[in-house]
Amino acid sequence: MGARLRSAHDKSGPELMKTSLRVLAAAVGFFALGLQFYVIAAPLEGAELTKWVIEYFCFFTILTNCLAALAMALPVMAPRSALGRFFDRPSVRTAIASYIVIVAAVYHLILRKYWDPKGWALVADVLLHYATPAMFVLDWLVFVPKGQVPWRTVVTSLAFPLVYVAWTLVHGAQTNWYPYPFVDVATLGLEQVLMNVAGLLVVFLAVTAALTGAN
């Protein structure tokens, strides 16, 4: 009896830590997403507000943070649901980890100079580009089971970035608006944008391969 209790206690410690981290990360993630939407949307009305709703979901940062928040929340809130099981897969969490690492790196190294947020916008910026990535990577390092990420994840993880690029180029061609300067066809031309995209896809492959190998 005592041995069983000790075993249960040993298991409950790491499980409690995992649950606590995921609840905190999900709360921070959803708060940051809502705050980022609000600080831009607050003064807008009518067509401008509708336009912002569409543009909000055109940012890779926003979409990736949505995935990260869902991946933290659903395995805790609905662990037996199809989505809860999906987001708890080691391969899925590894793919999202690679996306969120690239979000943080690209923002810090390339995009930060284009954006100077103040006040609540700065809070949202720090949470989306630094806090959420750090918590998700910490969760991946500590709680994703080792040796369970197949190498095909390196290739399959490209599906989301490829769909995103396709949508960005199609939407941009219709609206002449692009969410990031390195995919701005109107300014750079299609050839340069495709070269930029190819370079980023190589980075995605490299980061996912590194994470898969580390697992």
Residue ranges and their predicted role:
Residues A27-L44:
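Alpha-helical transmembrane segments of multi-pass membrane proteins
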Residues L83-Y99, P150-L158:
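Interfacial segments of alpha-helical transmembrane regions
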Residues M17-K18, C58, T175-A210:
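Membrane-interface transmembrane-helix boundary segments in multi-pass integral membrane proteins
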Residues E48-F57, D88-R89, W115-L128, W151-V155, ...:
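Non-cytosolic membrane-interface motifs at loop->transmembrane helix junctions
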Residues A159-Y178:
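Juxtamembrane non-transmembrane "cap" segments at the membrane-aqueous interface
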Residues T61-P75, A131-L141, N196-L211:
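Hydrophobic cores of alpha-helical transmembrane segments in multi-pass inner/ER membrane proteins
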Residues A42, A71-S81, I102-P117, L138-P145:
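Membrane-helix exit/interface motif
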Residues D10-A26:
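N-terminal membrane topogenic signal
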